[in-house]
Amino acid sequence: MPVVRRRRALAVTSNEEREIIQTLLRNCSNSTTDMVPDVGFGPVSNYTDPNRLKQEIDVLFRQFPIIVGHVGQLAEPGQFITHNETGVPILVTRNRKGSLKAFMNVCRHRGMRVANELCGKAAMFTCPYHSWNYDLDGRLRGMPQPNGFESIDEESLGLVALPVGERFGLV
């Protein structure tokens, strides 16, 4: 039996949008694409200029959400992933209540990463430098020789939280 495809009416607000949609539907039906009339070239510096790279990183990785993984990587409490590709060390985990949490992957004492693996499962995150311990909610839970740190406020020294969300199976 042949497959019958029905087209739904689209809510289009302008002639330009209508033309774009019609072109896309025509291209799909004809298994083709629109091609530009001539080969285009741009300056090679668009791809090699370090200043442009810095601008792109500042805009794309600092002002917009980034995808760091799939929810399947964080299916159970304690599972975590790290992400370092944007120049910011990120740690994402699922806490004991099942909520996603994201933090700077940086110990608040001396700046070491508290998770060095790309992914894994942990009950706590421990800094390899001085063994400060953080729970799955990012709270500082312990340190060796706490009597040497009597003047600090442990509540204010948790991992630095970052915004995080789940959309369409992506984190």
Indicate residue ranges for each PLM-predicted region.
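Rieske [2Fe-2S] iron-sulfur-binding domain
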Residues: 73-171
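Peripheral, non-cofactor segments flanking catalytic/redox cores
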Residues: 2-35, 40-46, 51-54, 100
